[in-house]
């Protein structure tokens, strides 16, 4: 029993395979599970069970994703793999599978291909902080110089998108070789696992980040003042803390004089909890749904940003027709809709359902945001797109 308890405190890290179609992402996923189970213990998963990915719905978008888990001596990994290119695009944009690091799979026989580039760009846009490269199918390349050339190309491509191409780990291996139990290639999988352990830092836990709570509801309580309710997204709210009310209107600051949960008074509320916060001297009409309560100075309101957007297909309940510049939908951030104007990249006249696109947005009211914030695009209450804030313009 004590072993079980010990396992649970291992740091938990989310990773995933990205890269061009048929470069071996799913084979590598199976090879990692199988090899690490053999070396460190744990459950092996075969190719077929991973490739047969169940479809999930995230905000109404259908995404096929396989989730596997594996352990190294120091960490527990949750790993996502998608069968199709479109699934990757949707996954990365919706944040359905948040990644603390990505494993970019590049076949040594092909070198970088169009989707290699697209996945690196998406990784940059949606904020995947670390990338490790696994050069696959190296058993099919006899020429050492060719391997070096491919590695150089991949490193240059990563540098082009602001990843540290010169410094990040590149492992040359063969996923199939490792799956077939060939020792030299199994060793490369262990090397990849060691690179994950050493190169991807332990993610900061939500509770350790600066306090933020999206406001869902506002009540005034006779004789006590104004209470705002919501689910704490990150950090801790202590009674007596100074808090900022950010978004929609000018930012104001007040003091939290009470925290309650299920009508019980608490000393603090923590990330993941639904609480009510009593605000000193704040009137009922000074706060509204869509604003956030946050540690002062930790987040600022903005109206203009660049985003990466996936437009739902007709089958997913999205639009049946394309949209053009001048389109003015609602952008749903956390708890509220705000109208915004879009501008499309140069040379793009229209956007079709099922496309993914970079677009600049200008909202009619400011929203508390930082890069990496997810949103939905809605028309009359139905979701027609999903996006992520890639870059904020002041």
Curated annotation (Swiss-Prot):
Residues 81-84 are annotated as: G3. Residues 174-176 are annotated as: G5. GTP binds at residues 19-26, 81-85, 136-139. One of its GO terms (cellular component) is cytosol. Residues 136-139 are annotated as: G4. It holds the Pfam family GTP_EFTU. Its EC number is 3.6.5.3. Residues 10-204 form the tr-type G domain. One of its GO terms (molecular function) is translation elongation factor activity. It comes from the Bacteria. Its main location: cytoplasm. Residues 60-64 are annotated as: G2. It catalyses: GTP + H2O = GDP + phosphate + H(+). It is an enzyme of class 3 (hydrolase). Monomer. PANTHER family: ELONGATION FACTOR TU, MITOCHONDRIAL, ELONGATION FACTOR TU-RELATED. Belongs to the TRAFAC class translation factor GTPase superfamily. Classic translation factor GTPase family. EF-Tu/EF-1A subfamily. This is Elongation factor Tu. It comes from Vibrio campbellii (strain ATCC BAA-1116).
């Amino acid at each position: 029993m004590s072993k079980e308890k010990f396992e649970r405190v291992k740091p938990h890290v989310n990773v995933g395979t990205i890269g061009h179609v048929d470069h071996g992402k799913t084979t590598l996923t199976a090879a990692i599970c199988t090899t690490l189970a053999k070396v460190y213990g744990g459950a092996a998963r075969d190719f077929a069970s991973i490739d047969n990915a169940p479809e999930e719905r995230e905000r109404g978008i259908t995404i096929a994703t396989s989730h596997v888990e594996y352990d190294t001596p120091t960490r527990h990994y949750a790993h996502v793999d998608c069968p199709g290119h479109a699934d990757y695009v949707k996954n990365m944009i919706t944040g359905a599978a948040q990644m603390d690091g990505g494993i970019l799979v590049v076949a040594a026989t092909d070198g970088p291909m169009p989707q290699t580039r697209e996945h690196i760009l998406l990784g940059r846009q949606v904020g995947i902080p670390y990338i490790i490269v696994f050069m696959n199918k190296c058993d099919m390349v006899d020429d050492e110089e060719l391997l070096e050339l491919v590695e150089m190309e991949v490193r240059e491509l990563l540098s082009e998108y602001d990843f540290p191409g010169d410094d990040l780990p590149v492992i040359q291996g063969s996923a199939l070789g490792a799956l077939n139990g060939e020792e030299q290639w199994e060793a490369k999988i262990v090397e990849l696992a060691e690179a994950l352990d050493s190169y991807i830092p332990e993610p900061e836990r939500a509770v350790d980040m600066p306090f933020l709570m999206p406001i869902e509801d506002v009540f005034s309580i006779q004789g006590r003042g104004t209470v705002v309710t919501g689910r704490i997204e990150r950090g801790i709210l202590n009674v007596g803390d100074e808090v900022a009310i950010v978004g929609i209107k000018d930012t104001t600051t007040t003091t939290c004089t009470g925290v309650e949960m299920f009508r019980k008074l608490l000393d603090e509320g923590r990330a993941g909890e639904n609480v009510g916060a009593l605000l000193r001297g704040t009137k009922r009409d000074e706060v509204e749904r869509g604003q956030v309560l946050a540690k002062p100075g930790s987040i600022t309101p903005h109206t203009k940003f660049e985003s990466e957007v996936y437009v739902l297909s007709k089958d997913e309940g999205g639009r049946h027709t394309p949209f053009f510049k001048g389109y003015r939908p609602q952008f749903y951030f956390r708890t509220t809709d705000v109208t915004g104007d879009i501008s499309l990249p140069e040379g793009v006249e229209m956007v079709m359902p099922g496309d993914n696109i970079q677009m600049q947005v200008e909202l009619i009211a400011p929203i508390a945001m930082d890069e990496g914030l997810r949103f939905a695009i809605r028309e009359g209450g139905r979701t027609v797109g999903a996006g992520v804030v890639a870059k904020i313009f002041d």
